[in-house]
Amino acid sequence: GLVDFSKAEPRFDFTANIEKANLQRLNLYKENIDINGQMDFRFTGSDIDNFLGSARIHHASLLKNGKHISFDSLSIVSTREGNNKTIVINSNEFDATIEGEFSINELPNVFQTFLNRYYPSYVNPPVRQLKNERFSFTVHTRKVDDYIDLFNKRLSGFNDASVSGSIDS
């Protein structure tokens, strides 16, 4: 495979079989989560906000605090046309699309604001003020509660759900 850091936008074009990667030690997640599986990366970008291309993880599993969850496939495709960015995520557990002008780094705050509006007793408002974000999104879930539980034990009831909307902050 290829990992090229010689240009302003690094290029990643490789396939890997990861036996164990700790996302916390790689500075990809705050908590201690191990992942293993097969990965196929074909993208450019120096950070998550300028990621363009595709990343696929399959035959994988996550381990957090002794809890083990397997997943067969997760595919992320990111494209851009002018200022309009589109990200499509497909898996056995859910499908999601987000399209418009947005910063991936700001999405947690945006969705925290959105969820706080409808679930104020479960989700606190974000600490930081939102930047200008204009996008639409759709999410269709199948059996996702076990995965959500890994990241937020207070949220549940999202199996077999559909959520769509738009944000203009």
Predicted features along the sequence, with ranges:
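Extended, charged low-complexity segments
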Residues: 125-129
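Hydrophobic lipid-interacting interfaces of membrane-associated proteins
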Residues: 1-10, 15-48, 53-109, 116-124, ...
